[in-house]
Every structure is written in structure tokens, then in C-alpha cells.
Amino acid sequence: MNQKLVPVNTAGCYIPGGRYAHIASAVMSVTTAKVAGVKNIIACSPPKEGVGAHPTIVYTADLCGADVILNLGGVPAIAAMTNGLFNNPPADIIVGPGNQFVAEAKRILFGKVGIDLFAGPTEIGIIADAKADPEIVAVDLLSLIHI
């Protein structure tokens, strides 16, 4: 038995950026596509009122190797990447977390385009007693913070 890994031509990386800049999502999705040998990497992140896409998301996506960064969020972003809008090739796969609308768009389009999973909001809980090292507890709390 063996396995053959064949990179897709185009990956669409959705990077949430509404309330918080999800820099980790940019790193995890764009870097993975780059390392896998994907030829075209399209990143989408929603605009913040008056400033466009969050500057740290744009910087991070560019640093990680995104070929195109669209200032577009939510369902329109998923549709744009799936259908190859704005003179971009259509995505073979859409990856990245999002709100319930992004998850539903990915569910509806599954089959036309590959998806990673139906990602929901990140939740974390820390259980510590009086003997816990406060520094370690603080690092645990900061582990999934999105600024």
C-alpha cells in the first residue's frame, strides 16, 4: 500500500478578521498550502470599517506566501474563491474557520469545491487550582487569543 500526494492548483484561505485579527488562521492556512506546493493561494479577509482588511492579516498572509489577498469576508468571500472571481482561478479547496454563515456556505458548496471542515468558534477552558504556576496558566489563557 502506498500514498501519492498531489497538490491542488488553487487553495482559497478564509481568514476571519471581523472583531479580531485571526493571524494564526493566516499562518495555518496559507503556510500549509505553500508547503504542500499549491500553485495559487488566494486569501480573503473581511474589511474593518474605514481601514480595509486588518493590516496584520494582510502582512501575515503576504509573508506566508499568499499570491492574492482579497478584502472580502463572509459568504461573498467563499463564493468569490469558489467561482474564481476577480480574474482569479477557481479554488479547488476552501480552508479556514468562520462564523455560522461561512460554515453554511462551505457546507452548501462541498462537492463543487473541497473543504477542510466546518469550523466553529474557538473555545478554551483552563482548570487550575491554588498550586498552579500563574505564569503557565497565563500562557495557557493566551494560547488562542486573537488580537
Feature annotation, model-predicted:
Residues 145-147:
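Conserved small/polar residues in nucleotide/adenosyl-binding loops
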